């Protein structure tokens, strides 16, 4: 197994926190399972007067073997602890290891949450989830960090893509500051890139504004690649709420593309539903509902019958439902 990354050091009175170290990759194997990837180290906190938090380290990649090794989780982003400072970004999760035999493939690592902002400062972005290989579970995206008093919430990390399994969900956006700031946008859902099973991952929800500010937009749903039978795209995330005093609701994320069907007469995949728009609380406009995902095309087969070419056409899938307005 790969070693874990070390944590970054915290700053003193002022200055940025140190970044966390990356986890090591696992070693490949032939007749036993591949090694696990190491965890990413956490980022250090910023200075007590001012300074940004350090970024979290990335998780190591799981290795290939008779069974696949697990990918390491990303390290948490450090907080901006002082009067002002931005939270550090969360580390990305490591890819899971594929498998060359009956044991299961390795699970991918999760993206880590972004650090909180200081009294004035934005929250850090969440890390992206790791890719699921050969049917392994993909890693979910990390949540964006919250702002403290004045600042915007961090964006959620993207969900990991997958082959032969479901795409992972995107992370939620962080909340805006208690006095002013917008919510962060939700992360994109993971796509399904290959295989006859699995649907696109859900987009992350947008972060809420707390007093004055707009809600964050929901993340887009993951797209679905073609398969023998059409599979569905992922749903978009809902938009965040506007501030209690003023602010618009966030827009819902669009749904993912439905997958094309390849088999004769098979129906294409349904597009993912659009996310709902976020509400406005007191003064402001509600968010728009997200667009539904496009449908996948139906499968076809052309064959010569008595010298004539005939075609069997599968019906296209259904478009995704449009999200409700806030």
Please identify what each model-predicted range represents.
Residues 1-326:
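Glycine-centric low-complexity repeats
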């Amino acid at each position: 197994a790969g070693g874990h990354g070390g944590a970054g050091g915290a700053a003193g009175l002022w200055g940025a926190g140190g970044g966390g170290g990356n986890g090591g990759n696992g070693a490949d194997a032939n007749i036993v399972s591949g090694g696990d990837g190491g965890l990413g180290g956490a980022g250090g906190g910023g200075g007590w007067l001012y300074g940004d938090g350090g970024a979290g380290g990335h998780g190591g990649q799981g290795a290939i073997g008779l069974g696949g090794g697990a990918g390491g989780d990303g390290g948490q982003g450090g907080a901006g602890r002082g009067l002002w400072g931005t939270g550090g970004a969360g580390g990305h999760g490591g890819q899971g290891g594929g498998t060359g035999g009956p044991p299961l493939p390795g699970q991918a690592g999760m993206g880590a949450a972004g650090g909180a902002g200081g009294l004035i400062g934005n929250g850090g972005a969440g890390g992206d989830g790791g890719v699921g290989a050969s049917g392994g579970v993909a890693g979910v995206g990390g949540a964006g960090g919250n702002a403290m008093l004045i600042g915007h919430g961090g964006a959620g990390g993207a969900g990991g893509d997958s082959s032969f399994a479901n795409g992972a969900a995107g992370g939620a956006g962080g909340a805006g500051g208690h006095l002013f700031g917008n919510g962060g946008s939700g992360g994109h859902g993971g796509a399904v890139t290959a295989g006859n099973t699995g649907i696109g991952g859900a987009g992350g929800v947008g972060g809420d504004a707390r007093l004055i500010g707009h809600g964050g937009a929901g993340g887009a749903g993951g797209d679905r690649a073609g398969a023998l039978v059409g599979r569905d795209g992922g749903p978009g995330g809902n938009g965040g709420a506007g501030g209690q005093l003023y602010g618009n609701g966030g827009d819902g994320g669009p749904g993912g593309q439905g997958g094309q069907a390849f088999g004769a007469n098979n129906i294409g995949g349904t597009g993912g539903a659009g996310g709902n728009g976020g509400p406005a609380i007191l003064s402001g406009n509600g968010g728009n509902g997200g667009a539904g995902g496009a449908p996948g095309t139906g499968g076809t087969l052309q064959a010569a019958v008595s010298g004539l070419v005939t075609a069997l056409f599968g019906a296209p899938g259904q478009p995704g439902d449009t999200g409700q307005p806030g």
